[in-house]
């Protein structure tokens, strides 16, 4: 599109980015689909895995899809690093018809089904392609037919077209943040990206999870200013750190008081997401406004 163009052509979404339209046959139907975003290292995989476990405790059939080349999204559910879709495709010279479900889908805690999409080497390819191929494989093998909940755990705070690919499938996006400036700044960018995509996709913002935070005052100030909402608060508990070291979800840990507190919050979050949330119309804040709101005096 030329800089002189004054209108965005039909078929594009957000800031002039080209929208890749999904084939109808590749759409996920019959399940509630959530995409989990947040600043790199904020605890998205911990949040996603414990949320998947919580949904399973509520009796839901859950599939978690890790969308990070590190392929560690599901290791607390499975207890190991499982092969990625991109790796098993390489093994068959990218002939997906030669793959069996057991080659790339692994059962984890309480029956949660786990898939690691993986990704191309750094600086090459597009992560969005890998996500698309993963969903196609799942559809071809009818692995989504009996699923109630699908959770995409998405790489870092990347909001390019590639790693926005899960938004094409998601009903709602959940943002993981912390009670600090950098995390909230990243959340603001993610809100802008999701809102742009929601012009043409069904995805809507569900809200944020304040993770590894003793307090939530900064998160709450931002939410008030942006008409966003906080869905849950996961305190900075050593039990959560230990669960990662033990390769377990909180629901597989011994029942000490901190573990029970965190479990209860995840179960409450899962139930609220399942029941559905009132619609909202959040807006991202200009950079200067965030600095004035949360920056140092």
From Swiss-Prot:
It catalyses: chlorophyllide a + oxidized 2[4Fe-4S]-[ferredoxin] + 2 ADP + 2 phosphate = protochlorophyllide a + reduced 2[4Fe-4S]-[ferredoxin] + 2 ATP + 2 H2O. InterPro entries: NifH/chlL_CS (IPR030655), NifH/frxC (IPR000392), P-loop_NTPase (IPR027417), Protochlorophyllide_ATP-bd (IPR005971). Mg(2+) binds at residue 45. HAMAP family: ChlL_BchL (MF_00355). Belongs to the NifH/BchL/ChlL family. Homodimer. Protochlorophyllide reductase is composed of three subunits; BchL, BchN and BchB. Coiled coil: none annotated. It is an enzyme of class 1 (oxidoreductase). This is Light-independent protochlorophyllide reductase iron-sulfur ATP-binding protein. Pathway: Porphyrin-containing compound metabolism; bacteriochlorophyll biosynthesis (light-independent). Its cofactor is [4Fe-4S] cluster. GO terms for biological process: light-independent bacteriochlorophyll biosynthetic process; photosynthesis, dark reaction. GO terms for molecular function: 4 iron, 4 sulfur cluster binding; ATP binding; metal ion binding; oxidoreductase activity, acting on iron-sulfur proteins as donors; oxidoreductase activity, acting on the CH-CH group of donors, iron-sulfur protein as acceptor. PANTHER family: LIGHT-INDEPENDENT PROTOCHLOROPHYLLIDE REDUCTASE IRON-SULFUR ATP-BINDING PROTEIN. The lineage of its organism: Bacteria, Pseudomonadati, Pseudomonadota, Alphaproteobacteria, Rhodobacterales. It comes from the Bacteria. Its EC number is 1.3.7.7. Component of the dark-operative protochlorophyllide reductase (DPOR) that uses Mg-ATP and reduced ferredoxin to reduce ring D of protochlorophyllide (Pchlide) to form chlorophyllide a (Chlide). This reaction is light-independent. The L component serves as a unique electron donor to the NB-component of the complex, and binds Mg-ATP. Pfam families: Fer4_NifH. ATP binds at residues 41-46, 70, 211-212, 235-237. Binds 1 [4Fe-4S] cluster per dimer. [4Fe-4S] cluster binds at residues 126, 160. Keywords: 4Fe-4S, ATP-binding, Bacteriochlorophyll biosynthesis, Chlorophyll biosynthesis, Iron, Iron-sulfur, Magnesium, Metal-binding, Nucleotide-binding, Oxidoreductase, Photosynthesis.
């Amino acid at each position: 599109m030329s800089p002189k163009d004054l209108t965005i052509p039909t078929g594009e979404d957000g800031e002039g980015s080209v929208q890749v339209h999904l084939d109808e046959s590749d759409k996920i139907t019959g399940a509630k689909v959530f995409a989990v975003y947040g600043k790199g290292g904020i605890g998205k995989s911990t949040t996603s895995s414990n949320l998947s476990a919580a949904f399973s405790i509520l009796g839901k059939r859950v599939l978690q899809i890790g969308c990070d080349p590190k392929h560690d999204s599901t290791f607390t559910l499975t207890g190991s690093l499982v092969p990625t879709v991109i790796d098993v495709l390489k093994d068959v010279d990218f002939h997906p018809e030669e793959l069996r479900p057991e080659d790339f889908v692994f059962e984890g805690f309480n029956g949660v089904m786990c898939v690691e999409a993986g990704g191309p080497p750094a600086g090459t390819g597009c992560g969005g392609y890998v996500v698309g191929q993963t969903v196609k494989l799942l559809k071809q093998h009818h692995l989504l037919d009996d699923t109630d909940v699908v959770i995409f755990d998405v790489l870092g705070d990347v909001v390019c077209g590639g790693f926005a690919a899960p938004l094409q499938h998601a009903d709602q996006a959940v943002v993981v943040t912390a009670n600090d400036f950098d995390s909230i700044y990243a959340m603001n960018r993610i809100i802008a990206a999701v809102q742009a995509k929601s012009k043409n996709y069904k995805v809507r913002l569900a809200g944020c999870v304040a993770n590894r935070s003793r307090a939530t005052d900064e998160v709450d100030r931002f939410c008030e200013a942006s008409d966003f909402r906080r869905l849950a608060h996961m305190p900075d508990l050593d039990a959560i750190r230990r669960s990662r070291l033990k390769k377990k979800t909180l629901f597989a840990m011994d029942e000490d008081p901190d573990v029970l507190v965190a479990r209860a919050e995840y179960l409450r979050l899962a139930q609220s997401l399942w029941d559905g949330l009132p619609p909202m119309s959040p807006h991202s804040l200009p950079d200067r406004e965030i600095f004035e709101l949360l920056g140092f005096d």
